[in-house]
Amino acid sequence: LQNSLNFIDGLRIDRALKFVWQAAPQWTALSTLLLIIESVIPLATLYIFKLVVDHLTGTNASIESGSDFQSLSILIAAALGLAILSNLCNALLGYANEMQTHLVADHMQHLVQAKSINMDLAYYEHPKSYDKLHRAQREAPSRPLRIISGMTELALNSLTLVGAFALLLMFDWIVVIVVLAASIPVLIYRIKYAEALYQLHREKTASERLSRYFNEVITTAEKAKEVRAFGFGPLIANRFSEIRLMIRASLHLISGQAYRRQFITESTAAFAGYGALAFIVYATVQKSISLGETVMYFGAFQVAISSLRPTLSGLAKLYENNLFLSTLYEFLNVPKSVPDPLHPMAVPRPWRSGLRVENLSFHYPGTDRPILHDIVMTIRPGEIVALVGRNGSGKTTLTKLLCRLYDPDTGQITIDGTDLRNFKIEDLRGEISVVYQDFGRYHMTARENIMLGRPDIAPDDPSIVQAAQWAGIHDYLIRLPKGYDTVMSRTFADGEELSIGQWQKLALARAFVRDSQLILLDEPTSSFDATAEFEFFEKFREMARGRSALIISHRFSTVRLADRIYVLDAGHLIEQGNHEELLALDGVYADLYRQQASYYQDESQSVNNNNIPALSTAFSK
């Protein structure tokens, strides 16, 4: 069944043609016209040579003997004109194909990017999904280009071949049948090879991804410090080599078998072809055809043979490229698991009763382990809420559900009583600012990094500077050589490398520039020093005034600022209240607080013994 599906995919040339036409309709039309003209020129040239030979041998009655040189000059001039026209068409065709290539490659990349932008986060929970994405990314840039060049060569050779066969049919249809029949095994073997190659690449996708990952580990700056500090570069390089050796061994096995079959089938076709040529020679000896016709048929035979091999190869390559391109279609056709509603409602602005989580339960796709169980919580307008719990208790997962990166298994999340699933996803997320623990580090200017939080604002919008001031990164940025227009990476000219704490401040600025009604901060000061953390939260209430905020933190100096605190434990919401109420409850929150407080007390005692004030005591005041 799979082989049948692969064969059908390989024949779906219409999909590739559709992409090519969508990307470059004018250049495609021009290429088609030039191909038709260029395919006719060799046949017209052959006919002219026939007339020349017949004239020289006196067998062309249509040419008068008194004007030999003039007639020959006209024929030679016509042949020269066709040669110049062929050169012109060839040059224009090369230019048109180059324009097509760039346009189609960009179009295909745009399709992959557009699909990736709207892909549900759940898609990335499965290794097979990464395989699909890898295949789409690998094939999207190159396969359309190969299809364009392949279709160009195939069309040119096919049209030329048809014309050559038309001339040979004037001699004897047996010649055409013999040549075609001998070519069928060649085409079959090439198609089988394309299918085997395609199947191998599908089976080895995970291995190819792993080898690419190992290559990135030892060739990019991200892991460079640890690679050198621990000296494990050669180990990773060996792992890379082992995987590539395994992939090459499989490829060599398939290729070796294929090329043995190629030799046998093409040799058989050669015997048949030259047998047909001998038939033409025999007819000439028997004087069944004129010498001019012999030259024309010999030329037609040479054109047919020289066009037949690339035609068969082109058909097989087109089949192969369509097979590989089917991986792109497979990716583009992945359905959404978090869809927009058919009839979306407007997101309330301002929120009145706020956001409410009602009996929410959730587990990640592809797993059986529940992450959240029957969660009930409320975030009122203008309220700062903290979420506390041990690692793995489900805190970050809850923020993903609030942004509707996933939908709950049971229960619902509402804004002013309306389920989030009734809002257009883009509109909902436009009302939320979020900073995750694994915030993005974009190798763009500082200004552009902040503007990503609100792409519609102008580069000189004052809210950019205001957001940077709230995040505590403004003073650093204005001291850079190009200020806010400095690229945040040394991988580009005149760039600067940020510390992890500075990157986190830039991520906070990106969230604060957004005109949203809910701010979600997941460990927002995890990379701050004590002074920076203190200064940040001094400004936070001013920045968040009129907005709701949910803060996830393990630092109780941060948590105690909240109006209300929820405590998660193993996916269950077990406690809620303010700082004093939860301490009085003497439950999980109080236990976590005492553990952290004991550390600070020990630190404070150690520092005070040396008559040095502890910064950490500032957060207990």
Can you say where each PLM-predicted feature lies in the sequence?
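Membrane-integrated ABC transporters
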Residues: 1-42, 61-75, 93-97, 114, ...
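Transmembrane helix-loop-helix hairpins at lipid-water interfaces of multipass membrane proteins
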Residues: 28-92, 165-197, 271-278, 282-298
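Alpha-helical transmembrane segments of polytopic integral membrane proteins
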Residues: 10, 46-53, 109-113, 126, ...
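Cytosolic ends of transmembrane helices, especially the final helix of ABC transmembrane type-1 domains
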Residues: 232, 276, 297-333
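Extended non-transmembrane interhelical loops and adjacent amphipathic helices
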Residues: 1-14, 101-145, 207-250, 322-335, ...
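Membrane-spanning helices that line or support transport/gating and their immediate boundary helices
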Residues: 52-55, 91-99, 103, 107, ...
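ABC-type nucleotide-binding domain
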Residues: 348-621
